[in-house]
From Swiss-Prot:
Keyword Plastid part of the UniProt annotation: no
Protein's UniProt name: SRY-related protein AES6
InterPro entries reported in the protein's UniProt record: HMG_box_dom (IPR009071), HMG_box_dom_sf (IPR036910), SRY-related_HMG-box_TF-like (IPR050140)
Keywords: DNA-binding, Nucleus
GO molecular function: DNA-binding transcription activator activity, RNA polymerase II-specific; RNA polymerase II cis-regulatory region sequence-specific DNA binding
Organism of origin: Alligator mississippiensis
Keyword DNA-binding: yes
One cellular component (GO) term of this entry: nucleus
Length: 72
């Protein structure tokens, strides 16, 4: 069972197609670096919808898998 996405991952998933459209030849490592930089530059107020979405995912995950323990 996968862990629920955090706020950054929710935001990153929503942006996935945009970066690929702009730079289809860019490597995943570079895309990840750019997403990380953009996330850090976002205002806290702009992050709120993604934080709330991540919290909803976390609560649903807890309900769906009550005995889940993260084991890397």
């Amino acid at each position: 069972v996968k862990r629920p996405m955090n706020a950054f991952m929710v935001w990153s998933q929503s942006r996935a197609g945009k970066i690929m459209e702009q730079s289809p030849d860019m490597h995943n490592a570079e895309i990840s670096k750019r997403r990380g930089k953009r996330w850090k530059l976002l205002k806290d107020s702009d992050k709120i919808p993604f934080i709330r979405a991540a919290e909803r995912l976390r609560l649903k995950h807890m309900a769906d898998y009550p005995d889940y323990k993260y084991r890397p």
